[in-house]
Amino acid sequence: MLQQFTLLFLYLSIASAKTITGVFDSFNSLTWSNAANYAFKGPGYPTWNAVLGWSLDGTSANPGDTFTLNMPCVFKYTTSQTSVDLTADGVKYATCQFYSGEEFTTFSTLTCTVNDALKSSIKAFGTVTLPIAFNVGGTGSSTDLEDSKCFTAGTNTVTFNDGDKDISIDVEFEKSTVDPSGYLYASRVMPSLNKVTTLFVAPQCENGYTSGTMGFSSSNGDVAIDCSNIHIGITKGLNDWNYPVSSESFSYTKTCTSNGIQIKYQNVPAGYRPFIDAYISATDVNQYTLAYTNDYTCAGSRSQSKPFTLRWTGYKNSDAGSNGIVIVATTRTVTDSTTAVTTLPFNPSVDKTKTIEILQPIPTTTITTSYVGVTTSYSTKTAPIGETATVIVDVPYHTTTTVTSEWTGTITTTTTRTNPTDSIDTVVVQVPSPNPTVSTTEYWSQSYATTTTVTAPPGGTDTVIIREPPNHTVTTTEYWSQSFATTTTVTAPPGETDTVIIREPPNHTVTTTEYWSQSYATTTTVTAPPGGTDTVLIREPPNHTVTTTEYWSQSYATTTTVTAPPGGTDTVIIREPPNYTVTTTEYWSQSYATTTTITAPPGETDTVIIREPPNHTVTTTEYWSQSYATTTTVTAPPGGTDTVLIREPPNHTVTTTEYWSQSYATTTTVTAPPGGTDTVLIREPPNHTVTTTEYWSQSYATTTTVTAPPGGTDTVIIREPPNHTVTTTEYWSQSYATTTTVTAPPGGTDTVIIREPPNYTVTTTEYWSQSFATTTTVTAPPGGTDTVIIYESMSSSKISTSSNDITSIIPSFSRPHYVNSTTSDLSTFESSSMNTPTSISSDGMLLSSTTLVTESETTTESICSDGKECSRLSSSSGIVTNPDSNESSIVTSTVPTASTMSDSLSSTDGISATSSDNVSKSGVSVTTETSVTTIQTTPNPLSSSVTSLTQLSSIPSVSESESKVTFTSNGDNQSGTHDSQSTSTEIEIVTTSSTKVLPPVVSSNTDLTSEPTNTREQPTTLSTTSNSITEDITTSQPTGDNGDNTSSTNPVPTVATSTLASASEEDNKSGSHESASTSLKPSMGENSGLTTSTEIEATTTSPTEAPSPAVSSGTDVTTEPTDTREQPTTLSTTSKTNSESVATTQATNENGGKSPSTDLTSSLTTGTSASTSANSELVTSGSVTGGAVASASNDQSHSTSVTNSNSIVSNTPQTTLSQQVTSSSPSTNTFIASTYDGSGSIIQHSTWLYGLITLLSLFI
């Protein structure tokens, strides 16, 4: 019972084992190590180390499963091992046996068996290194001849396979360094047989061999030749390692013993080389000596005898074994389709014979048939073991067309160009251009003939010397036409009979020809002695006559008689015009065609009957557009193939197009039987995609994909709702208008910037009864003329001016000097004489105004020495009062100023003034140091009568500021025809202050459009810096039309305010921001140019409470719907202001006088980090929201003053004075200040005083 169970288990184990593939999955490397000091890296030299990757998965492989690695063109394993284990982490998962192909097969194998260590839960992988040597030939065996073509010198691809899994690697093989034209030899060890194959190739003879003797032997008795394993042949070529690639039989005589082998040969054709190889057994296969016989005679050359002796050594293969056992190779026939090698079980301690069994498939006999065609077909008639199977190969053969041409080479080449699609090949024979040949034939005393060719170099003349034995001679005498006698010897080819011809001059001859009754002709010559007259009598029978009737192309008949010589046949040719012909073609039952012509008499009609065998028929079924079926037979010409065309109505078709991952398109049609439905499946590669983003009128975004036909480009159209748009109109220095749209990303805000040329300005000054001065600007539409109305107070003022030289330029003042300051807040607003309350329905706010009046006093003292350098000391103080309030805001400012100015020529107080005939050449250098101390107390500047918003301003603020200002101005005269000043001023301001900013308001004369606003107001604290700049502009005296001095001043300063950061809800949560970059740039006429660049760096830390936005009077306001969430924000602002000043110079009038034309277009740009921008257009003597006030006069005072007061600008969109202001966030508290002299003239200030007043405006 146990035995039966054991047998059953063994049977089940064997039955469950299977062959698996794909275990060897990568060819990692193939490197060469020189095992025996070889001269080059040849594929057949040991050792090539192949590193292969393998993997075993326990879920698909089981213990006992086998897998085999086939290694084509591998000769042997160069190792003493017989197997190798596939090991991972020290565990053997499979054992692989080495089987070398050697001389038995063209490949080697590695046969492996899975071990029990592989479990279903294990997946093992690793690498294995196999030491091998490749087979690139070396003998004349069929195995070596096939493998001799495996590789070539250079880069090769080595491919092994494990079932259907191929693994490859590229490797570089070096060519043999041995000269292939000399004698060649090779030796190779076969470890499995413990024998050596030895090869010997005769030296090269280009023109072939006349004879030769070659072979090898051993005189020491340590080598035995195996005469049963010898290959002798001639090869037509060698591979890159000097091994034969072919073997053909030839004529030779062989002598073989155990001590040596030798052959004698003769007449080997050109292009071939004899070779011999044999198996030898040596006492030590790694060290033995052979003596080589090497005698040969090249065609056309002398005999050569060059024997040599070689002592062979090699690497020792431990597989050879030293116990002297006999190794026998046996062959067994199996039913497999390939040849395999196996070693039968062998115990070296018991067995004395080791058997290597070669498993060969059933032998086959090949029967080859041929036909004219292109493709080869194979068929096999199988047979059982012991018999021979038959393989029938139907081989196509081609007919050939030979083209012969000459070339410059020395040998004849034949190239066959095989036509892959037709059965006619072209054989191109290139014959070397032959040397001219001179043949000389001479007789000698020998009884045989010889021919010797003396070959000259190419381009020379070859000489062929023929030596012949003497011929026999026959003498013939004959008459000839000459009047003298000659004797000529006609030499026959050697071995034949020469003829001696004696030619005598002929006798005179009389010939008589006559016809007679006989049917034959006779000629009778009556010969006279030499010198006499011979008589020739010719008797001829009458000629026969043949009449031939033929047709020709003419329309008439002729008869022609052609007379033949006597004994010939006269011909009568009758030519008739051709008959008409009727041809009838009919099919008959025979397999051949005939043509029968029934000829009618001339002038009638001939009949041609063509009988053809029936044509072959091919039936084709196709679909057409009709709804019914038809059958049409297309009859081919006789001998062709008739076509039966069956047209069926088309099947219904269902077409399906789908995209797939490949880069090409395919169309597959599944054809149903007639009457069914065909399916067309189109697979297209995915189209390229172009994405386009556009805006549309809806409030939401969509994405649409427009699919193009296959091969086109799909379009993804993203439609975004339109961005909000903020339109800003500003003036610039050009004479034309432009519109620029700055498009933000989707969801942002687009900005439309309209740039208009500045309007002309007309300034009117009036006096009124109020105690303060105001300036009202009536802004015309772009292209019109703006009007600046200045209302002056009639109250008195006092200005103390101490100057030695400036009295001629700056007049003294008889009444007080006022600076009118107006602060707009959320609850009140008053501008000029207007005081009309206005309310906003959506917010329910009450608007009014509060006027703050500042009275200031300025004392200036100028000291000049030698007219070259002037010093000026100026101080000013002011008081701000609110007439409508019970409490006053008092500002006490002390501004001591010291300045030094110098120029190259004499001037007044450092300011250049010129008459009509004098142009200043001076530059101005000003160095100013200013110290400002301000103490401000502001209990409540608002009127207590406004009860609805009293709490907004009930918190008093006390501000103490200490500032140190340093002005450094360097002048540079950059004049052309007309002189100008260029001044660069750097101002550094450090200020610490605490300021409460009141809510801004909208004036009563404002056209206000309000839309619903969803506003959640929360306190906002800003840290800000506000600068006020007063700029001096000096105008020289020009000459009028007739030389008089006239002045035309048209100052148009432009102030633009912009932000340095973008506003958002999140931005208001930040700590500090940098902002305030102010640049005042004049645009001047062509006759004047003064450029002043002022850089102001101000660092200010000041908490400011910024309430709701407000816009001053004269401004059209549009409020857009917004959703604003105001949150407490503390901003630290740094302002940097650039200010430029312009002084006009003399211009020449068209009548010869000088008339200055001053076009002052100053651009002041201010930015804050509170994420807002406000652009204002400032016209002379105009009131500007969030910007400045400037005034100018056109009289002869030559004095123009521009005061630019910048206030806090917070979260304000871009705004233009004459355009709409759009705001949905806290806006600007406007502080406007103007300086007058009380008489309609504007007080003149220098550039440094302009910057000083800017500083003072922070605190006043």
UniProtKB/Swiss-Prot annotation:
Pfam family, one: Candida_ALS
Coiled-coil spans in chain: none
Record's keyword annotation contains Lyase: no
Compartment(s): Cell membrane; Secreted, Cell wall
ALS repeat residues: 365-396, 401-432, 438-469, 474-505, 510-541, 546-577, 582-613, 618-649, 654-685, 690-721, 726-757, 762-791
Membrane topology: Lipid-anchor; GPI-anchor
Location of region: Disordered: 896-924, 954-1226
Record field: transmembrane: none
Annotated S-S bridges: C73-C150, C96-C112, C205-C298, C227-C256
Positions with biased composition (Polar residues): 896-918, 964-979, 1002-1062, 1073-1090, 1111-1154
GO biological process, one term: filamentous growth
Post-translational modifications reported in the UniProt record: The GPI-anchor is attached to the protein in the endoplasmic reticulum and serves to target the protein to the cell surface. There, the glucosamine-inositol phospholipid moiety is cleaved off and the GPI-modified mannoprotein is covalently attached via its lipidless GPI glycan remnant to the 1,6-beta-glucan of the outer cell wall layer.
Tagged with keyword Transit peptide: no
One Gene Ontology molecular-function label: peptide binding
Keywords annotated in UniProt: Cell adhesion, Cell membrane, Cell wall, Disulfide bond, Glycoprotein, GPI-anchor, Lipoprotein, Membrane, Repeat, Secreted, Signal, Virulence
Prodomain positions: 1239-1260
SUPFAM superfamilies, per the entry: Bacterial adhesins (SSF49401)
InterPro entries associated with the record: Adhesion_dom_sf (IPR008966), Agglutinin-like_ALS_rpt (IPR008440), Agglutinin-like_N (IPR024672), Agglutinin-like_N_N2 (IPR043063), ALS (IPR033504), Fibrogen-bd_dom1 (IPR011252)
Induction (record text): Highly expressed in biofilms with down-regulation during later stages of biofilm formation. Expression is repressed by TPK1 and SFL1, and induced by TPK2. Also under the control of TOR1. Down-regulated by Riccardin D, a macrocyclic bisbibenzyl isolated from Chinese liverwort D.hirsute which has an inhibitory effect on biofilms and virulence. Induced by caspofungin.
Residues linked to a glycan: 471, 507, 543, 579, 615, 651, 687, 723, 759, 820, 886, 918, 973, 1045, 1068
Signal peptide span: 1-17
Covalent lipidation (GPI-anchor amidated glycine), chain numbering: G1238
Entries under PANTHER family matching the protein: AGGLUTININ-LIKE PROTEIN 6 (PTHR33793:SF2), ALPHA-AGGLUTININ (PTHR33793)
UniProt function note: Major cell surface adhesion protein which mediates both yeast-to-host tissue adherence and yeast aggregation. Acts as a downstream effector of the EFG1 regulatory pathway. Required for rapamycin-induced aggregation of C.albicans. Binds glycans and mediates adherence to endothelial and epithelial cells, thereby playing an important role in the pathogenesis of C.albicans infections.
Family, similarity comment: Belongs to the ALS family.
Protein name (record): Agglutinin-like protein 1
UniProt source species: Candida albicans (strain SC5314 / ATCC MYA-2876) (Yeast)
